[in-house]
């Protein structure tokens, strides 16, 4: 195809401009993939971004509620949470992008080391938001009792709150915010 070199040069130029930009979303939003897999019937565990409304209706509802509250966010997985740090007043991902807070929307399953890392980030100065509930258990069956014990130790360190009210609890240099009213709870992050 004779136009291919020109077309590829155009794509290269466009990509260069796109890569010069910086994301400016307000929040990191925890992607509860273990909840999604747990709720899928059968043994074929697929993850396709184009059918999220069918695979994860609760998560998509939470995303709509966050967006309708006037905020936007980027999804983050367990693996990327593990490498996220708190630096210069922001949560910074391994890619170097900074965010003002991390939101966990109504997740039920979360690895114990991820919950512990979120608590440590709050102690360092980060804002961590739990909407509707704290996660209640760890995923999987490998070393499940050991993981549950570790999980329960961290869970006992989190503020004992009624999620029916928006609560801001100082944790070290940061804070943990809890609640079920998305607009009010997210507004407590003081992000404009």
Residues covered by each model-derived region:
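Carbohydrate-binding surfaces of carbohydrate-active enzymes
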Residues: 1-192
């Amino acid at each position: 195809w004779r136009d291919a070199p020109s077309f590829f040069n155009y794509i290269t130029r466009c990509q260069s401009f796109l890569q010069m930009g910086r994301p400016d979303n307000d929040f990191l939003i925890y992607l509860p993939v273990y909840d999604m897999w747990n709720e899928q019937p059968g043994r074929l565990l697929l993850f396709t971004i184009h059918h999220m409304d069918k695979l994860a209706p609760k998560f998509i509802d939470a995303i709509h509620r966050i967006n309708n509250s006037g905020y936007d966010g980027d999804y983050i997985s367990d693996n990327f949470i593990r490498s996220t740090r708190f630096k210069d007043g922001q949560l910074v991902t391994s890619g170097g992008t900074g965010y003002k807070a991390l939101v966990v929307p109504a997740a039920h399953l979360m690895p114990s080391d991820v919950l512990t890392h979120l608590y440590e980030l709050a102690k360092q100065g980060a804002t961590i938001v739990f909407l509707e509930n704290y996660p209640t258990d760890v995923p999987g069956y490998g070393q499940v009792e050991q993981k549950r014990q570790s999980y329960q130790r961290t869970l006992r360190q989190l503020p004992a709150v009624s999620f029916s009210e928006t609560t801001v609890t100082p944790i070290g240099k940061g804070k943990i915010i809890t609640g079920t009213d998305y607009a009010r709870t997210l507004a407590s992050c003081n992000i404009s």
